[in-house]
């Protein structure tokens, strides 16, 4: 999320709408939750804190981590994860997948990397690995909607 275009907001918004419309599933969206945490701060100023005020920066990131992992462990029934080149510079997605695996939450991974670049750890945590969102929708529809028609 930290290094993804728009924090990954676009794909999350799209899949959130599909999940609600087709499966009646609610979503914890870390982008939305981060925006709530950041509403009192200027985003550019916040990003500068990584160098100018690391203590303050870490304090806010820790709030996001706690909220995020609490959602994975205590609120989520399953995890949807986009695995692409943006994960190489971050750690949150790795942690979410690992925590979800440890707590026996299904993990649906949309892999956009060559298979040789997909970490064996992440590959082994995933319940299902697909290459695109349309394939994910088929998997989720079959699992949670008994394969009924979806839009």
Language model: regions and residue ranges:
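Conserved catalytic or regulatory cores that recognize and/or transform ribose-phosphate-containing ligands
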Residues: 1-151
């Amino acid at each position: 999320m930290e290094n993804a275009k728009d924090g990954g907001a676009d794909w999350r918004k799209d899949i959130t709408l599909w999940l609600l419309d087709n499966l009646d599933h609610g979503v914890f969206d870390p982008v939305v939750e981060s925006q709530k945490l950041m509403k009192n701060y200027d985003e550019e100023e916040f990003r500068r804190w990584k160098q100018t005020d690391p203590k303050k920066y870490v304090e806010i990131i820790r709030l996001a981590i706690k909220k995020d992992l609490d959602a994975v462990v205590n609120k989520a029934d399953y995890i949807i994860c986009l695995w692409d080149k943006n994960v190489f510079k971050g750690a949150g997605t790795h942690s979410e997948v690992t925590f979800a695996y440890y707590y026996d939450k299904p993990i649906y991974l949309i892999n956009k990397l060559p298979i040789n670049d997909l970490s064996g750890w992440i590959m082994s945590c995933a319940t299902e690995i697909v290459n695109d969102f349309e394939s994910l929708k088929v998997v989720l529809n079959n699992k949670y909607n008994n394969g009924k028609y979806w839009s």
